């Protein structure tokens, strides 16, 4: 039976970075891991309507830096920064004795963020929109923005069927085993009266090389063609 690897975890340390950065003693590892999960789940739940894509946490001695990537930063920041100040005080109570700093970063194109796309499809399914329509719309939006490939999968008791099944659409390329391939991945859950449906989204954005993005490859190809013409 084939085993699936997580597209982001598979590329950590190669072209992807860790969402949590800290180096604790072995005895503190589990404690800090649970603290991170608690903070991330709390922020995602508190700002569900803000479209929070991911939360990054960095710890340096007694300082904790939190980066919130969201499609609607105004909701997280609040009027004159009041909301983000309230969030900071709440997290300070969760982590007593720590110096907390929070930065809010905008996701400029939510249609290209796999996590936000997955959550949007799940929300549409909960509102009884056809799953196929939601999936195809998400794929069309990503391809119009110039992405190389998109895959969307929905699994569960689709449409209230007696048996669970999965449906998926793939348009373009999706090189899952190529480490230099920049693949964004998102997962969401849709709660319906028939049960739970899982939604997974993969977006292939092109290849990443040590020197930069895939434009380097294009430049090399152009130089080779030019040299061939001159030769």
From Swiss-Prot:
Key words, A-Z: Ribonucleoprotein, Ribosomal protein, RNA-binding, rRNA-binding
Domain KH type-2: start-end pairs: 39-108
Molecular function in Gene Ontology: mRNA binding; rRNA binding; structural constituent of ribosome
Highest taxon above the source species: Bacteria
GO cellular component, one term: cytosolic small ribosomal subunit
SMART domains, alphabetized: KH
Family: Belongs to the universal ribosomal protein uS3 family.
NCBIfam families reported for this sequence: rpsC_bact
Protein name: Small ribosomal subunit protein uS3
Gene for this chain: rpsC
């Amino acid at each position: 039976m084939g085993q699936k690897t997580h597209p982001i975890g598979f590329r950590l340390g190669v072209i992807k970075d860790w969402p949590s950065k800290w180096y604790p003693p072995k005895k503190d590892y589990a404690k800090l891991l649970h603290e991170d999960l608690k903070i991330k789940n709390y922020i995602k739940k508190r700002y569900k309507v803000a479209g929070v894509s991911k939360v990054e946490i960095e710890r340096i001695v007694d300082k904790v830096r939190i980066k919130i990537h969201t499609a609607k930063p105004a909701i997280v920041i609040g009027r004159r920064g009041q909301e983000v100040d309230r969030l900071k005080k709440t997290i300070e109570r969760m982590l007593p004795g720590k110096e907390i700093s929070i930065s809010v970063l905008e996701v400029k194109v939510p249609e290209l963020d796999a996590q936000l796309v997955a959550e949007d499809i799940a929300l549409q399914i909960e509102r009884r929109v056809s799953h196929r329509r939601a999936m195809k719309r998400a794929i069309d939006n990503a391809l119009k923005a110039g992405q190389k490939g998109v895959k969307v999968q929905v699994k569960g008791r689709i449409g209230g069927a007696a048996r669970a099944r999965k449906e998926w659409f793939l348009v373009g390329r999706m090189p899952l085993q190529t480490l230099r391939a920049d693949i964004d991945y998102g997962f969401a859950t849709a709660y319906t009266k028939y049960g739970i449906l899982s939604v997974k989204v993969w977006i292939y954005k092109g290849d990443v090389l040590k020197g930069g993005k895939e434009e380097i490859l294009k430049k090399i190809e152009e130089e080779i063609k030019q040299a061939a013409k001159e030769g």
